[in-house]
Amino acid sequence: RSLVGSEMCIRDRSEVSKKFQPVGVLHSPYPISWADEERDVTAWIGNELQNEAFDKLYRLRDKIRAIDHPDFTYVWNFLQGSDHFYYMATKWFSDGDVHSYFNPYDSPYEAFINYMNVLSDFEIEVDKKYGEAIRAVPA
């Protein structure tokens, strides 16, 4: 079908927000998700694997900001991708099937090990660059 000649069109959210006024306020005191029966963030930070990976990643935040280098920022942003954490989900029953779709890993533990290895290598490079940045600051 074609939208030509119809009243339908495709707009991005910034265009919609300029064209229309809100009709009400949605109160959502907790995160809402499309994923799993709980519809919360447990698909990404709901087990020890995910929490350990998340915590290790965010311990690098201040160094990444201090380095202020586009290559490091790019990798930092990539490592924050939700898919990495989603692949580490250990949920069972109907939710477990969803987590196996499009997942390149055989298990959440394999996803965790791979992610932590990549993160450890990145941390080594961050520490080197951070050390260079600290030494370059005039006393």
Language-model segments: residues:
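Hard-cation-handling environments
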Residues: 14
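Histidine-centered catalytic/metal-binding microenvironments
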Residues: 56-139
